[in-house]
Design a protein with these regions (language model features):
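Conserved catalytic network of the ASCE P-loop NTPase/AAA+ motor domain
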Residues: 26, 53-55, 61-66, 87-91, ...
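Conserved nucleotide-binding/hydrolysis micro-motifs of P-loop NTPases
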Residues: 78-79, 102-106, 130-135, 165-169, ...
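Conserved G1/Walker A P-loop phosphate-binding module
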Residues: 11-75
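Residue-level signature of catalytic and energy-coupling elements of molecular machines
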Residues: 27, 33, 52, 72-74, ...
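Conserved catalytic-core segments of large NTP-driven translation/proteostasis enzymes
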Residues: 137, 148-296
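C-terminal effector modules of nucleic-acid-centric enzymes and ribosome-associated factors
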Residues: 134-138, 148, 263-582, 587-594
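Conserved Switch II/interswitch segment of TRAFAC-class P-loop GTPases
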Residues: 69, 75-80, 90-113, 121-140
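Intrinsic disorder/low-complexity segments
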Residues: 1-14
Length: 594
């Protein structure tokens, strides 16, 4: 994508933004097909020209007869470049499965179909290329073979269109088939969070660093601040192009080129993400559902090292099977992926897994929590959470993530990331949870939310801690607010806010009493029995008799040299309860004397 100069902006909108990608075996004519459809030769590298194969991703745009414009991604077919194919396929809505009529179904045809299935692609057209090299009888045989191959897959009912890029035969029918299929693509729910997985980075003279990708959710505008994840580096959008046209904003589903202000090309690579500042949190653990492909060749054992491909990233990971020790071919299970480097993902992201060596596609799945903690294997509680996150409704998913977030709670933005629930739907869901007292709002500005059961458990922990303190120090009127907060592990900021809110709610319910900086249970009374009770009565009498000229604290301690510890405790109790009024450090008065 080229970037036009300022002043050449075009008003350019789409009703539905769709990206079509190619798939198929090496040298089956994918690039020639795209060139015939769009006029663009997507093989731009010298090595690609010399070898006659696609190595890197290629991009173009396709104008359909009805006026809709599709983004197009041309992917490599060679087995050595499948990782590039996965990066390109991650953002597509429909696939053009290309099969050469003179060769038929080949190994990468099968592997690419597996990858498209694992990535959740549900629509496509099947293109039989190079028909000028075969006769009609052979073409009919190939067509039947392809139909048999596609049976039971998402392409089973898709149109099969024979074409020749050399003669142009069949291309009108192909355009019509693409247009019909594009109209069947269901518009996915937009989470509202701007996210662009980077699949290409280059430097353009006069403009600087440009990144491209398919905008998976949200929107972005010229001048906005964005963050490069997982680096945490922030920069601004200098310019935007969609299908070679300069625009002010780009929306979910569009192939987009973004010119980044003052950013070195060397710091960005394919697999990084552009997102809103602070919107995404990189993690080295991902909870997921996993399917081991039929025909994967061998069982998947716990802790197997694999190559993980998600959106445009490739990263090494270990598969921790949580519900078994090994997974048969064709089997499904729950797993946690432990990554070798941080990755920013969102619940609902699909992934492909390839074996470490020999490198081949063996499975894939769906991320159900991109920010989990380490789990205990075979835990009934953990497996129940996984089942709810994988199969439950939005309310069940939100409840699990709220509980996992603990007493610190979670912001609405992070809840979107960890559940995959679109922003508007999540806001309605949370309002219902507040009304039903299943969630607690901590801060409306930040939209930080707590699980109601977790919050109730925390209030119970406050009461237990106070009870323990009262039992240990029966002569003390209460525990200092700061000591209680520290004991419960509630730090400054959010922790202090939630702690203060819990104290207020407990006081409102009549369960505790907060007096200045001292906190006590509502039913707590200092109980003085035996000698301590008698000592208190004697101390009270001394102060009553002294009236406005009572002895100093030092003088009283000198009268009871063997009971100074008890006297000091009694001073604390009597001043806390208001019987003695402290005027200065060494002087108290009885309340009846004032």
């Amino acid at each position: 994508m080229l970037l036009r100069k300022a002043g050449e902006s075009v008003n350019f909108r789409f009703m539905k933004h769709i990206v079509m990608g190619t798939a198929g075996h090496v040298d089956h004519g994918k690039t020639a097909l795209i060139k015939r459809l769009t006029g663009v030769d997507t093989d731009r590298l010298k090595e690609e020209k010399e070898r006659g194969i696609t190595i890197e991703l290629g991009f173009a745009s396709l104008s359909l007869p009805g006026g809709k414009i599709l983004g197009v991604v041309d992917v490599p077919g060679h087995e050595r470049f499948v990782k590039n194919m996965v990066a390109g396929a991650a953002g597509i809505d429909l696939v053009a499965m290309v099969i050469a009529a003179d060769e038929g179904v080949m190994p990468q045809t099968r592997e690419h179909l597996h990858i498209c299935t694992l990535l959740g692609i549900r629509k496509g057209v099947v293109v039989l290329t190079k028909t000028d090299l075969v006769d009609g009888e052979w073409l009919d045989l190939v067509r039947e073979d392809v139909r048999a191959f596609l049976k039971g897959t998402f392409l089973e009912a898709s149109p099969i269109v024979p074409v020749s890029a050399l003669t142009g035969a069949g291309f009108d029918e192909l355009l019509s088939a693409i247009e019909r299929t594009a109209g069947e693509v269901e518009e996915g729910a937009d989470m509202g969070l701007f996210r662009l997985p980077v699949d290409r980075v280059f430097t353009m003279k006069g403009f600087g660093t440009v990144v491209t990708g398919t905008l998976t959710s949200g929107k972005v505008a010229t001048g906005e601040e964005v963050e490069i994840s997982p680096l945490g580096l922030r920069t601004r959008v200098r310019g935007i192009q969609v299908h070679n046209r300069t625009v002010e904003t780009a929306e979910a589903g569009q192939r987009t080129a973004i010119n980044l202000q003052g950013t070195d090309r060397a710091v960005i690579e394919r697999g990084y993400l552009l997102a809103g500042p602070g919107a995404l949190t990189p993690s080295q653990r991902l909870d997921c559902t996993y399917r081991h492909l039929t025909g994967a060749g061998r069982k998947l054992k716990n802790r197997t090292l694999v190559r993980l491909h998600t959106v445009t990233s490739e990263i090494m990971a270990r598969v921790i099977l949580l519900d078994r020790d090994e997974l048969e071919s064709g089997g499904d299970g729950f797993a946690q992926l432990v990554l070798e480097a941080p990755l920013a993902a969102v619940a609902g992201d699909r992934f492909v897994v390839r074996s470490y060596s020999p490198v081949t596609t063996i499975g894939g799945g769906v991320i159900i929590d991109p920010l989990p903690t380490k789990h205990k294997r075979s835990s009934a509680v953990v497996l129940r959470e996984f089942k709810l996150l994988a199969e439950g409704g939005d309310a069940e998913k939100a409840a699990v993530i709220l509980e996992r977030a603990g007493i610190g709670g979670i912001t609405e933005n992070l809840l979107i990331v960890r559940t995959g629930i679109p922003g508007r739907e999540l806001r309605r869901l949370l309002e219902g949870m507040f009304s039903a007292k299943r969630a607690v709002l901590v801060d409306r500005d930040e939209m930080r939310v707590l699980s109601a059961p977790v919050y109730e458990d925390f209030q119970a922990a406050i009461a237990r801690e106070l009870q323990r303190y009262h039992e240990r120090y029966p002569l003390k009127g209460g525990l200092s607010r700061e000591e209680l907060r520290t004991t419960l592990g509630m730090g400054d900021g959010v922790g202090q806010k939630i702690f203060t809110m819990a104290l207020r709610d407990l006081e409102r319910k009549g369960e505790l009493i907060a007096e200045k900086e001292m906190i006590r249970l509502a039913g707590h009374r200092v109980r003085l029995q035996g000698e301590m009770g008698s000592l208190r009565e004697g101390l009270s009498a001394i102060y009553r008799e002294g009236a406005l000229a009572p002895p100093t604290v030092r003088e009283i301690l000198e009268r009871f040299p063997d009971r100074q510890k008890e006297i000091t405790s009694l001073f604390q109790v009597m001043t806390h309860e208001g019987e003695l009024i402290r005027i200065c450090e060494d002087r108290n008065f009885h309340r009846d004397s004032l």
